[in-house]
Amino acid sequence: MPRVAIVGSFSTGKTTLAEAVAEPLGLPLLPEVAREVASLGFKLDKDATPEVETLIFLRQLYNEMIHDDFVGDRSLIDVMAYAGWVLDNQQRRREFALWDACVKVAEYQLRSQYTHVFYLPIEFPIVPDGLRPLDPDFQKEIDERMVKLLDLHDVKYESLTGSVEERIEELTARVKA
């Protein structure tokens, strides 16, 4: 049962790729949790709080737990990268304990949570969508955190580069292999 996580910074093509491969692979596409949380009125990215990051983490974990197989255009790795940036750039307060508990759960889960992890490096300019930041420096910082987390937690991953069509072909072939 494939559990496919597509990871990378914002505006790297994760959603486009996930939407393109889910149906041909016969796998459910996990909802994009951060956008759901934003629709509830919570602030994301640089303006998020430990409580918001904890909510995103719990929703992502829940979505992954209730599906035996899936394609996700986000993962616990993504959540940890963004939350790490948010919390590293705020003064520590007692609510950080919420996030600390999430990190412990994630560290236990990361290596066994996914059968395939595909990392999308930054290759394209940021596409404005009304929600994502337009800051290439922030995009690069998140990308660096993502790779560091993958390596730190010994998560096996494969990089995908090239056009959307090339990425679709490569991901599909690797999952079906």
Over which residues does each language-model region extend?
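Conserved lysine of the Walker
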Residues: 14
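P-loop (Walker A) phosphate-binding loop of NTP-binding proteins
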Residues: 9
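Hydrophobic anchor at the beta1->P-loop junction of P-loop NTPases
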Residues: 6
